[in-house]
Amino acid sequence: MAHRLTKEELDQQFEQFLKESVSDDSVDLGTSSKRPSVLDSLGKAPVRPVKKASASVPWWQDDDDNDDDSEEKGMSSTGRSFLKSLRKTPSIKEVDEEQPKELFLEDEGNRDHVILSRDSLEPEDSLVIPSAGARGLDTLDEDDDDARFLSNLKKVSSSSIDFSRINREQELSAPTSPLRREEMDSTIEEEQRMNKDTAASPAYSEDFEEEASDKSDVEPQEKKPERLGMLAKVSLHDSLNSTDGALAPAVPSLAVARENRPESKQTDMPALEPAVQSYGQSGGSEMEALQEAYRQISGSAGVCEDGQVEAGRTPLSLSTLQPASTVESDLPTAEELMQPIGPDSGFTRGFSLQPITEAVPRSRDNQSPLRISSDESPFSSANEGYGGGNTANLTGGEHPDSYKFTQKSISEEIRRLMQEQDTSSQEPPPLKPKKRQVPARSNASTSASSRKAPVPSVRVKKPESKPLHRVPAPSRAAQAAKPPSPPTLRKAQNQTFKKTQNLNQTHTIKGLDTSLKLSSELVESVQSFAAFLQHQVEASSLQDKGPFQANKIASEAMTAHKGMQEKMDGGPELASLERLRLQLAKKERELSLREDQLQEQHKQELTALRQENYILQSKLHRAEEASNKRKWSFGEASDPVTEEKLKLIEKEMKEQETLIQGYHQENEKLYLQMKALQAQSKQNEEALFMENQRLLTELSFARDRMNTNNIQRTIRERSIVDQSFNIAELTSQVQAAQKKEERLQEEVRRLKQEKQALHVDLEMMRKERDLAKVQAVCKSGDKGFELKLLHDKHREEVTELKKRLQWYAKNQELLDKDAARLHAATAEIQKLTEQVEKLKAEVSRRANEQQRKAKEKAGEAKRIQDLERQLKQKEELLKRRHPNSLPALILAAASTGAEEDRLDVRSLAQSSQTAALLERRVHRLEAELEGRDEAAKRSLRAMEQQYHRIKLQYEQQISDLEQRLSEKSHSYPAISSELIKSHTQTLKAELEEVKEVHQKQVSVLQAEVDSLQEQLRQAQASTQTEKPARSPSRHQLHAEAAQAARIERLTQELNSKSRSIQELTRTIERLQRERRTMLSGPSHERPNNEPKRHLGTAKDTKKPSVETFPPTQDEKDYHPGAFSGTHISEVQLENDSLRTKLEELEVLREKEKVSLQAAVTHAQNQLLRIEEQNAEQLTSVKAEHRKEIEHLLARHALEHSSSRVAELTSQLNTQEIIVQHLQGQVKELQGTKEALAVTKLREETLQNQLSKLLEELKEAKEAHSPELKHFTSLEQKIQSMEFRYSQREKQLQQVIADTRRVVEQEQQSEVERWRKLAQGRAKELEAFRMELDSILDVLRELQRQGVVIPMPEHTSTNTHTYLPLRS
């Protein structure tokens, strides 16, 4: 049992180390061996001979000893071999060239070379810490960095100094910096990849160069305390041929050679060739064919049973080793076919029925067999790191040039294999090459590998064109944890090509020997029977499986029947089967032992050469560092020149520190300026964006206006001839305007919804702001900076929201303008359409009248002439016969009646024309009324939008005022009443302005109403004056009555409109009152149902009371005196004169309307002024009246009350005033109390910070000298090392326990699997015996019948491919 340091010994050594001075004067950079230091013996045990690790005992039998050894190695010899916690430590190779490398070789005589052997489960590149013998590496790094820094400063002193870069370099070059560690880790990985001289053994450490040069030739053979990789040891005890500890003397050396010799260009297959050839040449009988069939049957059944048993299990992380193509399909890719077949992958195990995957965990069922075999080999992963030509070292001189394969030879080999595949015409090759392929079955392997040959032929080019790097061989656990890189896969493919070549050579020898032994009758019978069985198997399997599996089953059936036939021929010699198997296994073991010895010799020579090379390099580095040190040395410490130089250096360092501080402050200022400039640029960008948006909207509006102006101009320029085209264009414009109006209404609706959402967001943000204020008051004073940041952020968000609201208000204004323009355009369009209709009607009427008049004139002229002639004749007859009789008088009266009827017909036509004209006017007036209704609606909506906009502006002003008030309340505890009064006065002035605006709007509406009423009165007066002009006919009376009814209806509608306008004025006043209450009170809500109700009433009043025309329109009473002396031309003249009068009246009405509007506005302004003056006088009178009443009351109280009551009341008043004053003071004191609490909290936090800073200052003053800095850094490093050591111990214990548990589980699973496999083999043998008996019975029956079995024409191995039969 090794000696472990006790706690007392460690404490004693540590106290001695603390007593000893470790200053710069006492330590000579580790070069002097005269002064022994405590650091040399720190952590050392009492000097005892170092144990050698025994390689003959397995690791699980002496765990305790090994643990103790590892602990001894961890603590002995200056504590050099503590392993860092699973992180890559800097190797000796990448120490900077400027650092003195002689440190690592100075103290070689005083040190023991101790290595902590590690498990194979640890990462490969977790190296051993180099010793800190004379002085710590980190302190030496610091000294060298300081020296480098000063020299660089001297070099760069003339130019400008980049202090930020110097600080970064100092931080990166610090030995404890994590960035430097990561740099060193990355350089370790690169150097381990690139450096070809690095040792690959797991036990190789960084302490290698510390050994003396005279021991370099002897110690590689003496000191071999390497422990084998744990999984490598496990794999040695996998097979059934080995027992626990049976191969102890020879096998560990094999594992060591395989694991620790990456450069020895080893391969898996060539080591087997002597055994294979001796077996192929020493058979000489037909029993070999039977043994071959047994082997094939066992291999195929093992694969099938393993696939069935392990199909249900989920694959572990080892499945990531597959290429991407094999995860999804069952077909092997070229990379899988190129994987190396390890030496323990099935050839070295004899002929017993062993499983295919013997050293692989259960989770590898999803990998192809070749990949599994590549995972099994202890040094196959090491082979993957090197080039393709590394197979010829151990072949025994058979293929000395196989490692010099070029790209051309590989492609030729692939082409040859493909040609052989094409020539074999009996059955297709199997889908998956089996792992346990023996030399007689090499044809199947070549065909399987040649199937994917065109794919890797491209990839094989890469490894040979690049330099080959040597990588330390990882253990099997590390190999399972990470997938192989593409270079390693390509290099493994090269190895597989060479193995395929070796298999082909052995196959030729073996195939010729076995095939020449067959008799022709036997081969013919087996061929016929196998063809029959093949047809049966194909017919049954093609229904269940794919074509590839059917071919596979058929080929396996043929191979099995060949093996049966051979077994039948060699039946008498079944007893010697076991003897031959034992002899072959013995030969294989001898060959493997000889191979291991050769590998061990080669490894020892290589390690000796490497040690010599490394020692020479270290001597060279030591010489270089000595010369560098002579350059840097300033002489002894007592030299006055050196002291002056040191003072100058300290002075320069102080100056540089002040410069650095100045630059740091300047950098902070520049950073703040840059932030301010960024904020200003962002604001400028936002302003420019808003300006661009505004200009774009103005541009679009200007374009629309130009388009409308162009349309109007073109409409004006066109003549009446293009009326149809004008009507179509106008209708299209009307439709476009309607679409635009709908789109604008949709935008208005959407903007309203967004505005409501923004209102909700604003309320939420206000609540959040209040909560933040409350939290800020609740929190302590040291949160002031965070509160200020939050206030700034909140202010920025509020400004952004205000900008958005302003943008929405502007957008609303633009929409209102657009709606006004739209309204004007629709009015113009309506006017133009009315004009077009008028022109159409007039044109058609004139044409019809002309035609009708022409016809009537022609007909009437003829009739008149006939009637006049007849009348004259009759009158003449009557006059002649009875001049004074009654019939003559009746005839005279009838003639006059006919003339009156003719005149009545003319008057009826004229009255129908006037009725049509009046109806058109009525329709036009109704359209105007509807337009007015729509205008009233739009104006109401515009007023609502203006109200909302003004409300938004007021809310924004209120929020601004609240914010200012809160800021001033924070800055000043109390605000004077004068400021409040000024604020209220400004608010009142703004309210008065809003009142004036709304009253002006109301006055404008009232003026419009009055003008309309005046127009109606004038129209009524004109109609009344026109009535008594002449005695109208009956139809004219009816038309006038209908017109009067319509005028009355229109007046009623006008009255209803005026009532609705009055209601609207009332709603406006009510809204003003609500706004006042809203501004005075906290509630911002407004009842929205009132305007809707009034709108509904207005809509109800808009419906006119429908009145029908009088029913006497169609009656035709006889009036003999009507139109007695008038003609149609007179009626037309009267109509024209009436029309001109009507136009003149309309012009007069417009003028009077304008003048009345001006007079109304003037009167309203005067009325407003008078009302304001009256209100001011009333308020002044009220105030004077109140003062007089108070004065009278006071005087009355003084006159009519006793002096005691007056005194008491005055005292009471004074007490109340004092109480109010004291309450104000109490409120002020409460505010000051809260401020005092906040300041107390701030003071406490500042005192705590001050105490911390004083402590840090004290520590900095204590540690201002380099000795104290060195001492404190060493203390911290010792503590960190102890902590890491304890962590490492715990991790090691955990890893050992986990590996024990895993190994036990694997052993149990292996035993169970072997048991199941043996049972399956026994069942297969029974079935095989039954099939053989049936075949023998068939052959006996054929012989008894006298059937002669013919000899085959060509017997070669290429024509028959025998595969095992799947039972």
From Swiss-Prot:
Its main location: cytoplasm. Residues 61-71 have a biased composition (Acidic residues). Residues 440-453 have a biased composition (Low complexity). InterPro entries: CEP162-like. It comes from the Eukaryota. Keywords: Cilium biogenesis/degradation, Coiled coil, Cytoplasm, Cytoskeleton, Microtubule. It is found in: Cytoplasm, Cytoskeleton, Microtubule organizing center, Centrosome, Centriole. PANTHER family: CENTROSOMAL PROTEIN OF 162 KDA (PTHR34031:SF1). Required to promote assembly of the transition zone in primary cilia. Acts by specifically recognizing and binding the axonemal microtubule. This is Centrosomal protein of 162 kDa. It comes from Danio rerio (Zebrafish). The gene is cep162.
